[in-house]
Amino acid sequence: MVHALHETHRVLKPNGLLLDLRPGAVHRRVGIEVDGQYRQLAMMNESLEDDYAANQAVAEVIQKGVFKLVSRIQVNCNRVMALKDFPNWLSDFPNDRAAQQERLIRIVEHAFKEAKGNRKRVVVKGPLVLKVLRKDQV
């Protein structure tokens, strides 16, 4: 990752900006919303190793003066979907935790079945972090 950041630095024009937009390195919360009321059901247990490595790489190039941190903002991001779309969305995560994913699907399906209301949807909550980095002349 550090190599990729150095390559980005190489191709950016002087004082160019790099926008680093990634999910925050926290486990996402999974719940359902019924008629506008949210209820958390579970916390995902996805691997955060890649997130930690990316954060470390960005911190390293900032510390070395390759880039300067201009600003950082964290915003809540709610991924909203129909129940039928949840298993497909979940399949985007590494499949080394297939049993946990199946259990999570069953929990959400059961909550949907038991919930009383007209408008039901799955909501996955987690932060997005945007860092704006400026190319420094090394």
PLM feature spans:
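A short glycine-rich, Lys/Arg-flanked "PGG" loop and its adjoining helix->strand segment in the class I
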Residues: 2-17
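Short alpha-helix
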Residues: 48-66
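Short, low-complexity, polar/charged sequence segments that are solvent-exposed and flexible
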Residues: 8, 37-40, 88-92
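Conserved class I S-adenosyl-L-methionine
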Residues: 17-49
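Conserved Class I S-adenosyl-L-methionine
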Residues: 65-138
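Glycine-rich loops and low-complexity Gly/Arg-rich segments
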Residues: 12, 42-47, 93-99
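Alpha-helix N-cap/loop-to-helix initiation residues
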Residues: 1, 26-27, 79
